[in-house]
């Protein structure tokens, strides 16, 4: 993408006005999954992700974090997950034992606005509800 189409900061990273990022109960954000090397990439903007599911691409964590506003969205319950993403949100937002490698969502812990339904927020504690 040409610089004239997208602002670039002094570190050579693109600057998006908004990054709306999905999160999984396993802590993946975009297609940055736990215990995979893509999570630690620091220079590339976009990464290929080759997994058992169809191959995909994802923004790197530095690009996600370089957005002017970051919103992480988590919602939905199912028969398989009757409490939705509650455990994942607890681990992403308050669990001290998690690392970027084991739970990529912690990389956005202090920089994002977290939007979730009641089920996803149910394990966060009163200070978050």
Predicted features and spans:
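Conserved phosphate- and dinucleotide-binding cores of soluble alpha/beta proteins
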Residues: 1-129
């Amino acid at each position: 993408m040409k610089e004239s189409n997208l602002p670039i900061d002094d570190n050579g990273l693109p600057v998006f006005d908004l990054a709306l990022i999905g999160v999984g109960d396993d802590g993946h954000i975009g297609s940055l999954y736990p215990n995979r090397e893509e999570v630690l990439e620091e220079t590339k903007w976009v990464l290929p992700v080759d997994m058992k599911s169809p191959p995909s691409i994802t923004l790197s964590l530095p690009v996600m974090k370089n957005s002017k506003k970051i919103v992480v969205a988590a919602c939905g319950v199912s028969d398989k997950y009757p409490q939705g993403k509650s455990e994942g949100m607890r681990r992403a937002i308050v669990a001290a034992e998690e690392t970027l490698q084991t739970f990529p969502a912690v990389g956005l812990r202090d920089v994002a606005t977290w939007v979730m339904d009641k089920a996803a927020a149910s394990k966060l504690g009163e200070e978050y509800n």
